[in-house]
Amino acid sequence: MTKVVQFSLLLALILVLSVSLASAASQNLEFTELEDEDQSNLSTYIVHVRKPQVIQSDDLHTFYYSLLPESTKTTNQRIVFTYRNVVNGFAVKLTPEEAKALQQNEEVVSARPEKILSLHTTHTPSFLGLQQGLGLWKGSNSGKGVIIGILDTGISPFHPSFSDEGMPSPPAKWNGICEFTGKRTCNNKIIGARNFVKTKNLTLPFDDVGHGTHTASTAAGRPVQGANVYGNANGTAVGMAPDAHIAMYKVCGLVGCSESAILAGMDTAVDDGVDVLSLSLGGPSGPFFEDPIALGAFGAIQKGIFVSCSAANSGPAYSSLSNEAPWILTVGASSIDRTIMATAKLGNGKEYVGQSVFQPKDFAPSLLPLVYAGANGNNNFSVFCAPESLNRSDVEGKVVLCEDGGFVPRVFKGKAVKDAGGAAMILMNSVLEDFNPIADVHVLPAVHISYEAGLALKEYINSTSTPTATILFEGTVIGNLLAPQVTSFSSRGPSKASPGILKPDIIGPGLNILAAWPVSLDNSTTPPFNIISGTSMSCPHLSGIAALLKNSHPDWSPAAIKSAIMTTASQVNLGGTPILDQRLVPADVFATGAGHVNPVKANDPGLVYDIEPNDYIPYLCGLNYTDREVGVILQQRVRCSEVNHIAEAELNYPSFSILLGNTTQLYTRTVANVGPANSTYTAEIGVPVGVGMSLSPAQLTFTEVGQKLTYSVSFIPFSEDRDNHTFAQGSLKWVSGKYSVRSPISFIFL
């Protein structure tokens, strides 16, 4: 495989486009390819129905088929999937006219065209305080016996990260199957693998993208010594829960992830008996009753399954989140303290530090002519080094300064420079990305630098008639005290779907993460790994950590595990100062949520905020959803007129999001003691300007494990002190000895 093809494989994953995707069959899920009729006017619709009364699971397909218009029954069967666990309904190929006719059936709640959603480590375990044979890894048996279900692009089963040496057989509850054939496929590590995006050329759940292999090994990869990419980030690659089992559900391909396949994967995973679901994918914000991941996740938590999802890569814009439902752990991305360092050195002696994975040893450090790509390009896209935008006469043999953005993938910019004869590339961040360069596997000598450094390079180019530069490659450096830092791409809150719930919930490692890859990037014979970035990478870190907690505390609910993760999170970096964002200023709660995950502390949180599935009913009715819309989520008939509605902030969540106008708001929370039997917690509050807070009681005294106590907190507006600010943030901590149970608070001023 050529280097260009390899890089295309990588970028097709990261910048996946939203276009149509084929569906696939599964056990207990019906699938028919429509080969004998014109499909040009057919689209896949997701159909939600009222919960059938007293009907056997095996009869569901027949029941759903009976609802279809007669015009669909004259040719091949149109039903793509039938769902049994996470939603009441099915996916079907219809014309717009047939969909309209179907919606006239009183058993049908809704029928809408499906959307296509997009895909959103040698060092991270030690960065997070996980050590072999010690602490949480020892106490949780490294996740032994826990099953992590991963919905992604498939998996490469031959990779040593998925060796089952020394692993036990799957637990007796496991009900899944393996669709791989031949030898060395599923084993006691990969215990299940299904494909829901079958095509004529690819029917098995092999990973033809790379994303699924990377996320699976991040969550639960086995130790592999000598892991590296081009000699960088060398060490032992291991996942968060190395002894957990993996079940892969292939729901995505090169072009994205169809809603019908996602629902089919989640439906099957629940039936199979997974303990944790990990989804590094998502779509735009929308109401929960139209969100396939929110729907599937609610069905999962009803069965005690923890669900972790990526927050999306649309930052740093506010309200850019995916996967906002309160029953999902929404994970943003942060940096780690490892840098794959490269330096841009200018002819005036100044140096600007950046990052690059590709660090050729044969690149001479001598100065070369430096040119700005936007100076004499072929079109307006030359500044972004778009393909065929550069003149060979301008860039041949030179170092080319390119700008990030312009809808041109970073590695493709380097290819454009190389194709035009350029010797090297210096890539400067956009103003939004600022101080947040990313290490990429470039196709030529390159370095990614900050926006500020890029401005300095532009100024230098304009100051002399003979600007020169070179790139110094300095390898892997550990110990950046600014880590963790919120990445520029990590999506921010507040939530659009539910502004009264603070999102994201947590941040975790998502920048320059090394993990398993299906193919070698440098044609070496060593096991292939790759370094990529995204909230897709942070999500499986948290999924693996949840698996550790599930083993350590098998009686904890999904909400209790989430609470433990959130209330023990860190708000400071390795240097002991507040976590920063891409601008090198303190990150706000809409970027960090509760803070950066601390797995060791999460294993012993002291107190937890628990939520039962039925507790969400008054919350959902409080969102002013109709009875039918709430029923789609709950998979049961609901009459909100008979339910006590609650405000979003009244949900027993481990954080607060307060939409504060001119009146005082009072909310209650209940905490359960999971620490020492006899313990007293004292409240500490951090109150921002423009708000007053009062708490009752100010102390909580427990006498037994499992005991629950309730407190109330009032938020009082002081509008004259706000200085025209639109939001503020504070915190509430319950402190007892070594325990500090912290809830972040966001205030949105109305």
Curated annotation (Swiss-Prot):
Main location: secreted
Pfam name, any one: fn3_6
Reported induction: Rapidly induced in roots during development of arbuscular mycorrhiza (AM) upon colonization by AM fungus (e.g. Glomeromycota intraradices).
Domain PA: 369-457
GO cellular component: apoplast; extracellular space
Subcellular location per the Swiss-Prot or TrEMBL entry: Secreted, Extracellular space, Apoplast
Residues forming the catalytic site: D152, H211, S536
Domain Peptidase S8: 127-603
Disruption phenotype: Decreased fungal colonization and impaired arbuscular mycorrhiza (AM) development during AM symbiosis with AM fungi (e.g. Glomeromycota intraradices).
Signal peptide residues on this chain, from the entry's feature table: 1-24
EC identifiers of the protein: 3.4.21.-
Superkingdom of origin: Eukaryota
A GO BP annotation: response to symbiotic fungus
Residue ranges constituting the Inhibitor I9 domain according to the UniProt record: 44-120
Glycan attachment sites: N41, N201, N234, N380, N391, N462, N523, N624, N662, N678, N724
A GO term for molecular function: serine-type endopeptidase activity
Family annotation (PROSITE patterns): SUBTILASE, SUBTILASE_ASP
Family: Belongs to the peptidase S8 family.
PANTHER family (alphabetical): PROPROTEIN CONVERTASE SUBTILISIN/KEXIN
Role: Required for arbuscular mycorrhiza (AM) development during AM symbiosis with AM fungi (e.g. Glomeromycota intraradices).
Protein's recorded name: Subtilisin-like protease 3
Native organism: Lotus japonicus (Lotus corniculatus var. japonicus)
